[in-house]
């Protein structure tokens, strides 16, 4: 409650009536590092999706059906829990005329339109994040390098992929394409990173023009020396310079994807340029798998299926003899998986729930919720 009260004091000093706190960070991935989890900080909610609407006199937490039970358990005392799409912010704000602030780096214009367009409220993009004013965040200073995919894993050479992007740009008569989805940048250049706990993505943005000039924006400490040799025609630029570079481009035609391009970047680009708001063509291009990719997908399923089969056999033969808990069971499955030499990490936290915990969608066992596996329970 102390954190919320501090935030509400800031609302008063900013002369606004409310503030929206999303789960995501500026890269809009499903999983974010702890030091960027502002929603968890202000609400205690640990699910992978949701946002808080904090008004001067009420607090609301919006989640989807996966997390309704979890949200009530974790923060039902301080927040009114609302389940999307049954209840939307527009329903609460319908007859109000409030000034509500938000961080434009953490929202897309599409998200704002979906959730907040049907109100009489004024939504104000702020130049700073209000949660950061009360939270002394400790950023992870360990910078793990990006890396290039081995040839037997890449679908095709990155130069060929860029030609396909240029074709899409010419088709739309666009002079620039701003790629804001990190996973699409990874596909385009055949690279990977360590910026998400469960997905090997390199947090980045790409700006490509019709002459194939490419600017790659990221934390430069993550760029290995091998990149300069392999990507000699690509400029690697500190992500802090992106606003300055985009602001200097005028009277051009840009392709952006409104589902991944932040409100902040869309505003900068649209101020002096014409925008074509299309779905990023990379989503379609990367959905077409080569024979090699299909074979690798099959192998991954076989390897993981073998680990899961060994785990189920172990559970069947040991759960009555030994004390097996939700956490120890999840650890055992992890141990079976990591025996494979190609194993990198999990694709999401293992959902290991027994008895009543099994009813919680996307449940993640903790020291306080951890239960023993008992006979007769699912």
Task: Describe every region a protein language model picked out.
Residues 376-378:
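Loop/turn positions that initiate beta-strands
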Residues 1-94, 107, 111-248, 307, ...:
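N-terminal accessory/capping or targeting/presequence segment of soluble
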Residues 101-107, 153-154, 184, 281-285, ...:
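Conserved short loop/turn motifs at secondary-structure junctions
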Residues 119-140, 261-296:
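Terminal amphipathic helices with adjacent charged low-complexity linkers/tails
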Residues 7-10, 14, 96, 118, ...:
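Generic, well-ordered alpha-helical scaffold segments in large soluble proteins
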Residues 98, 102, 226-281, 286:
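Conserved catalytic alpha/beta cores of large enzymes that bind or transform nucleotide phosphates
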Residues 18-22, 326-348:
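Amphipathic alpha-helical
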